[in-house]
């Protein structure tokens, strides 16, 4: 297992912690590939009946893609990058056992999308989450598709086109968060849900989850190719590179 992920067992539940707190648990190649491998292995382990995803530290579940890494990307990197990102989301979707996200902080971009691929989401009123890709010069393609499974079109358009994050309170009101609890109770609530769902028949659980995947699989497959086309055009325009450069410079100034 890579150093960017921690694993804990709680009876029949496995807790996966994204462990890059110094960069708000941003997704780089190592974290992504480790997560894909780990989820695939856990799906084959009959002793594991539920999975809880969370992040290290008290600031972020996952802030999205590691901007230091993708600042070096060009249009030629889009195919391989997005193919592997899609594989990460698929690894979450393809779990035949319950997958619950326990939000310990902000969830943005790819981190938000991981959460949307899970079965249940537990958060707290003050947290922030959303789809800020457009502020980084990137088209919101995968995120806007995943939100269609949770939101009406009007709110989806608003979040995708403004890039603004919403509070946990609002996310619960519009149906993104399944459970809203005080911050200190998020993990306990998530583990309780996982324990209860672990007691249900694993065959019925697998078949029910497979049915939900079948209902949404055509769109999930199509969105990868749509995202590749859109992000190649975005990168060819130079907008992502410029937006990311400005963000990284501003971040460096704040740290200096």
Give, region by region, the residue ranges found by the protein language model.
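Glycine- (often His-adjacent) and acidic-residue-rich active-site loop
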Residues: 4, 55-91, 219
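Crotonase-fold acyl-CoA enzyme core
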Residues: 91-203, 237, 242
């Amino acid at each position: 297992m890579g150093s960017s992920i921690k694993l804990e067992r709680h009876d029949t539940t496995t807790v996966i912690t994204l462990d890059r707190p110094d960069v708000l648990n941003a997704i780089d190649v190592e974290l992504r590939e480790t997560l894909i491998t780990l989820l695939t292995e856990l799906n084959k382990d009959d002793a594991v009946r539920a999975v809880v995803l969370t992040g290290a530290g008290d600031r972020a579940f996952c802030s999205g893609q590691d901007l230091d890494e993708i600042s070096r990307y060009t249009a030629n990197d889009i195919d391989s990058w997005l193919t592997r990102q899609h594989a990460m989301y698929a690894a979450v979707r393809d779990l035949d056992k319950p997958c619950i996200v326990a939000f310990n902080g902000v969830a943005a971009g790819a981190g938000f999308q991981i959460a949307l691929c899970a079965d249940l989401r537990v958060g707290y009123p003050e947290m922030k989450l959303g789809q800020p890709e457009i502020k980084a010069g990137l088209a919101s393609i995968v995120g806007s598709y995943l939100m269609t499974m949770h939101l009406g079109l009007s709110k989806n358009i608003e979040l995708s086109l403004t890039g603004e994050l919403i509070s946990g309170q609002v996310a619960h009101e519009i149906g993104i968060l399944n459970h809203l609890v005080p911050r200190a109770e998020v993990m306990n609530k998530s583990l309780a849900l996982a324990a209860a769902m672990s007691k249900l028949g694993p065959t019925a659980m697998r078949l029910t989850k497979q049915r939900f995947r079948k209902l949404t699989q055509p769109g999930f497959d199509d969105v990868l190719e749509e995202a590749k086309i859109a992000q190649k055009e975005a990168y060819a325009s130079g907008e992502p590179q410029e937006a990311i450069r400005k963000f990284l410079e501003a971040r460096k100034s704040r740290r200096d």
